[in-house]
């Protein structure tokens, strides 16, 4: 990744950074909840972004 990024690329990276987090604890505690973990979690070394 270049040090000088275009604004579009930077926006995409920021979005992916926000998406890449675990499920909040209060979501797990909801009644009748089946969500245990974030299935779309991405590791920076294992799976690369198609940018």
From Swiss-Prot:
InterPro entries: Ribosomal_eL39, Ribosomal_eL39_CS, Ribosomal_eL39_dom_sf. The keyword Amino-acid biosynthesis does not apply. One of its GO terms (biological process) is cytoplasmic translation. The keyword Ribosomal protein applies. GO terms for cellular component: cytosolic large ribosomal subunit. Keywords: Ribonucleoprotein, Ribosomal protein. PROSITE patterns: RIBOSOMAL_L39E. GO terms for molecular function: structural constituent of ribosome. SUPFAM superfamilies: Ribosomal protein L39e (SSF48662). Belongs to the eukaryotic ribosomal protein eL39 family. PANTHER family: LARGE RIBOSOMAL SUBUNIT PROTEIN EL39, RIBOSOMAL PROTEIN L39E. This is Large ribosomal subunit protein eL39. The gene is RpL39.
